[in-house]
Swiss-Prot record:
It comes from Chlorobaculum parvum (strain DSM 263 / NCIMB 8327) (Chlorobium vibrioforme subsp. thiosulfatophilum). Belongs to the universal ribosomal protein uS12 family. Keywords: Methylation, Ribonucleoprotein, Ribosomal protein, RNA-binding, rRNA-binding, tRNA-binding. The modification 3-methylthioaspartic acid is found at residue 89. CDD domains: Ribosomal_S12. This is Small ribosomal subunit protein uS12. The keyword Nucleus does not apply.
Length: 129
């Protein structure tokens, strides 16, 4: 425990908080180019083939980003927009690709939570039975 004299000389230092998405460099989103699009398996209790892409960002940093939603049109050299947000059961995946922006299409036939997946509002005639 410091003495009062030591506190007068040095003061208390604030602990610097670490960002969860350092590659974004304090930006809300960043643009990048897909270098590889592939599937990977999640951690122990879960089982699936999760779609991910290796993305080279405009600041030359290469990251792994998750492709949300069912089906996608991404391939190598697709230009994508990424945002922060990790995937809990995929180690090393700390970013999400934004659906419906740049080369990424929105999720087809999405009825709920459409804004999160870049899906347009369905036509009024199609919704009625």
């Amino acid at each position: 425990m410091p003495t009062i004299q030591q506190l007068i000389r040095h003061g208390r230092s604030m602990k610097a908080s670490k960002t969860a998405s350092p590659a974004l460099e304090k930006c809300p989103q960043k643009r990048g180019v897909c270098t590889r699009v592939y599937t990977t398996t999640p951690k122990k209790p879960n089982s699936a083939l999760r779609k991910v892409a290796r993305v080279r960002l405009s600041n030359k940093i290469e990251v792994t980003a998750y492709i949300p939603g069912e089906g996608h049109n991404l391939q190598e050299h697709s230009i994508v927009l990424i945002r922060g947000g990790r995937v809990k059961d995929l180690p090393g995946v700390r970013y999400h690709i934004v659906r419906g922006s740049l080369d990424t299409s929105g999720v087809a036939d999405r009825k709920q939570s459409r804004s999160k997946y870049g899906a347009k509002q369905p036509k009024a005639g199609a919704a009625k039975k």
